[in-house]
Swiss-Prot record:
Protein name: 3,4-dihydroxy-2-butanone 4-phosphate synthase
Lineage of origin: Bacteria, Pseudomonadati, Thermodesulfobacteriota, Desulfobulbia, Desulfobulbales
Binding site residues for D-ribulose 5-phosphate: R37, E38, D42, R150, R151, G152, H153, T154, E174
Residues reported to bind Mg(2+) 1: E38
Pathway stated in the Swiss-Prot or TrEMBL entry: Cofactor biosynthesis; riboflavin biosynthesis; 2-hydroxy-3-oxobutyl phosphate from D-ribulose 5-phosphate: step 1/1
Cofactor binding summary note: Binds 2 divalent metal cations per subunit. Magnesium or manganese.
Keyword Manganese set for record: yes
Quaternary structure annotation from Swiss-Prot or TrEMBL: Homodimer.
C-alpha cells in the first residue's frame, strides 16, 4: 500500500529530485519513514529559507514540537549539550537542550519568535552566547553519515539540505490529524495533494545517496 501511494509522486529518484527542487525554492516537503518504525510523516523546511508563515503551519498542522536538525559540528559550535546523558528512548533521537534566541524575541513561543531563534542558531559565526536555554525550539543532532547511519527523520532532513546545496540545517514537525492522532501515509498523501507538496521516504534518500555524494 505504501509504495502504491508514494508512486503517484514519481519513482524513488524522482521523488528525491522533486523534493530537492522544492527545498531550493523555499518550499516544504513531507518525509515519511517505514511502517515498522515510527510510521509517521514530518513537515520539512530548510532553516535557510524558513519563514514565520511556514513555522505557523508546522505549529498548526503538526505536533507543535518543532525541531531544528543540525550537524554534529554545528551542535558542537553552539555548545549544546544533549538533553540527557543516557538516551534510552526507543529510536535514540538526538535531542539537545532546547533553545531560544537571546535577542529579538518576547516569550519565544510565537511563530515569529521561533523563526528568529532558528535564524540566530544557524547564522554564520553563531556562538553559544547568541542563545538561551531552555527555549521553545528543539535542536536535534544528526548522525555524521546521515540516513546511512540511522534511518531517522533527523538524518533525512539534514541529508536533504546537503543534497539541495543549502545550509545543512532543517526544520521538522510531525504531521497530525485534526483529532490529535498521528497522520499515517493515506492522510499524509492527502495533506500533500491539497497543498501541492512533494512526499518522499527516508528509504528514497538512502537509495539516492548510493549514487550521489554529499
Amino acid at each position: 500500500m505504501g509504495q502504491s501511494l508514494l508512486s503517484s509522486f514519481g519513482d524513488a529518484q524522482q521523488r528525491v529530485e522533486k523534493s530537492l527542487q522544492a527545498l531550493r525554492q523555499g518550499e516544504g516537503v513531507l518525509l515519511v519513514d517505514d511502517e515498522d518504525r515510527e510510521n509517521e510523516g514530518d513537515l520539512i523546511y530548510s532553516a535557510e529559507h524558513l519563514t514565520a508563515k511556514q513555522m505557523a503551519l508546522m505549529i498548526r498542522e503538526g505536533s507543535g514540537i518543532v525541531c531544528l536538525c543540525l550537524t554534529g559540528e554545528k551542535v558542537d559550535e553552539l555548545k549544546l549539550p544533549q538533553m540527557v546523558t543516557n538516551n534510552n528512548s526507543r529510536h535514540g533521537t538526538g535531542f539537545t537542550i532546547s533553545i531560544e534566541a537571546r535577542d529579538g524575541v518576547t516569550t519565544g513561543v510565537s511563530a515569529a519568535d521561533r523563526t528568529q531563534t532558528v535564524k540566530a542558531a544557524i547564522a554564520e559565526g553563531a556562538v553559544a552566547e547568541d542563545l538561551c536555554q531552555p527555549g521553545h525550539v528543539f535542536p536535534l543532532r544528526a548522525r555524521d553519515n546521515g540516513v546511512l547511519d540511522r534511518r531517522g527523520h533527523t538524518e533525512g532532513t539534514v541529508d536533504l539540505m546537503k543534497l539541495s546545496g543549502l545550509a545543512p540545517a532543517g526544520l521538522l514537525c510531525e504531521l497530525t490529524n485534526v483529532d490529535g492522532t498521528m497522520a499515517r501515509l493515506p492522510e499524509i498523501v492527502d495533506f500533500a495533494r491539497k497543498r501541492d507538496m512533494q512526499v518522499l521516504s527516508i528509504e528514497d534518500i538512502a537509495q539516492y545517496r548510493q549514487g550521489h555524494n554529499l
